Amino acid sequence: MKIVVIGTNHAGIATANTLLEQYPGHEIVMIDRNSNMSYLGCGTAIWVGRQIEKPDELFYAKAEDFEAKGVKILTETEVSEIDFANKKVYAKTKSDDEIIEAYDKLVLATGSRPIIPNLPGKDLKGIHFLKLFQEGQAIDAEFAKEKVKRIAVIGAGYIGTEIAEAAKRRGKEVLLFDAENTSLASYYDEEFAKGMDENLAQHGIELHFGELAKEFKANEEGYVSQIVTNKATYDVDLVINCIGFTANSALASDKLATFKNGAIKVDKHQQSSDPDVYAVGDVATIYSNALQDFTYIALASNAVRSGIVAGHNIGGKELESVGVQGSNGISIFGYNMTSTGLSVKAAKKLGLEVSFSDFEDKQKAWFLHENNDSVKIRIVYETKSRRIIGAQLASKSEIIAGNINMFSLAIQEKKTIDELALLDLFFLPHFNSPYNYMTVAALNAK
């Protein structure tokens, strides 16, 4: 069987690796428009902010390793058309050579693309997006310029907040804009997000929330020099757009069933409306256990799992995805936040009737006074069924990072907040208290 994979990042690589390791003997072709593969974009801000010296280790797979296993790798090759009826992929190389690859099974792993705000001046020099490695290189080069002193970041989600930190670490003045009233509004309720807002402000980042960009203006050399919002005009030397991503599904959007944002609709086997076409990662929908329906959640962790599921099903073993919770985390200037499932705001927007329980305590036992940080927790649950549908944690302690995984499993297994209240959680003073803050938050649920 011949399998063509379009896209060589997390989802495409996971699909190919699963096939190679579990179901050998197939002919595999991987195509990507970039010159590299397997770039961990989540590390861009860490590298650009000089928390690591070089970006080399942000790549975890090489073309030659796949080629050694018999895979045909076509990088710097742009797919122009897919003939789904005749099962053919049409592409063109960097040197304009035309390529036609027939397939028995096709895997679309084309990922997501930045949302480009349609504003006057959007094409000016000095306005950047941040997703691909080469975009990270461009921003890194801009940060190295002495004349680039004042940077505007539009969008205070994870990527925007992280690159704002990176710019500050490089000694820049940073203005962080978002139309919402807080940072991280897609993942956390306002009471939690404000903790990050305070952290950002304490580290010298100028916050402009509840502000909407309207226009970019240029200097005499054609570089962006001002950003105009609904409230004021600001002088800037560089703009980084981080307002979000949408599915990169143009190759198939008019032939396959799609979600409201253009993502390719798939079932729990990652199979599209065409039984010989699978879609994985950011280009596809995914089943949310919190929502109990298919939705769109673009995360690298989801991409890897969806690729594994697709690989098994293509290889001949029927395997259903168990669904996801959208578990995520962020660490900015030593302040850590993690969440999973739905926030109260998100749940209400989706029409769910929910309640929540908040609690705050020290991470370790009360008699340990050194390196014992406060932890805030919120558990979100359906009011009637009491099924847990979300959780949020915030602290300077890194221990919270592991705790969110327990809530992820609770959501997946449809556990109630009352069951959580009596869950056997270990106690050791170095790590927690006998009355664990997760236990107390659950016990306090009304």
Swiss-Prot record:
Keywords, ordered alphabetically: FAD, Flavoprotein, NAD, Oxidation, Oxidoreductase, Redox-active center
GO molecular function terms noted in the UniProt entry: NADH dehydrogenase (ubiquinone) activity
Modified residues (Cysteine sulfinic acid (-SO2H)): C42
Keyword Signal: no
Class in the EC hierarchy, top level: oxidoreductase
Active site: H10, C42
Subunit structure, interactors included: Homodimer.
Full protein name: NADH oxidase
Organism field: Lactococcus lactis subsp. cremoris (strain MG1363)
